[in-house]
Amino acid sequence: MLPQYGTVMKRGVLYYRTRIKDTNGKLVAIYAKTPEELYNKETLALEQIENATFHRKTPTVAEYCEKWLLMQSVHVRATTLTDYTSKVRRHIIAELGDKRMGEVSLDDIQLALVPVSKKSASVYKSVVILYKSIFRAAMESRIIDHNPTIYLTTKGGGVPQEDR
């Protein structure tokens, strides 16, 4: 059943009207000649607003990783930061940089870790720890609603040193 809409007369034509809040919280009027048409316009507009809000709230993996590296620069030595930066850019941003933080799943991360698993065990382990740290920080900052790395383990990846 359609909601009850108000009516407005404009230039001798009867229109149905509703108001919705846009992404900035400002009321926007939507007009249509029939209640069905107005309902369709309203649902489409609300969908677009929801989509815009979602994209505004969740940055891309690349954007958030750069921000995370900047935040880490306060806590770690310069050599550690250089190591983090190299691994984040090579193994995280290169694989998932264009995806939004809220859209990343455990499967995406595990697929991104496949090339890393061919590297040494220590590189694999540190990249997994970086993934976990970055997504934990995003969760704590309320950038994402759930942490996809919660079940990710450092076990089983990488080539042991004596086998190389």
Description of each model-found segment:
Residues 44, 48, 98, 155-158:
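A short linear boundary/processing microfeature
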Residues 107, 151-157:
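Short linear capping/connector segments at secondary-structure termini
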Residues 1-59, 63-71, 83-86, 111, ...:
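Basic/aromatic DNA-contact patch characteristic of tyrosine site-specific recombinases
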Residues 158-164:
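Short, intrinsically disordered, charge-balanced linker/junction segments flanking boundaries
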Residues 2-8, 101, 149-152:
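Short clusters of hydrophobic/aromatic residues that line enzyme substrate/ligand-binding pockets
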Residues 27-31, 35, 57, 69-143, ...:
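N-terminal core-binding DNA-recognition domain of tyrosine site-specific recombinases/integrases
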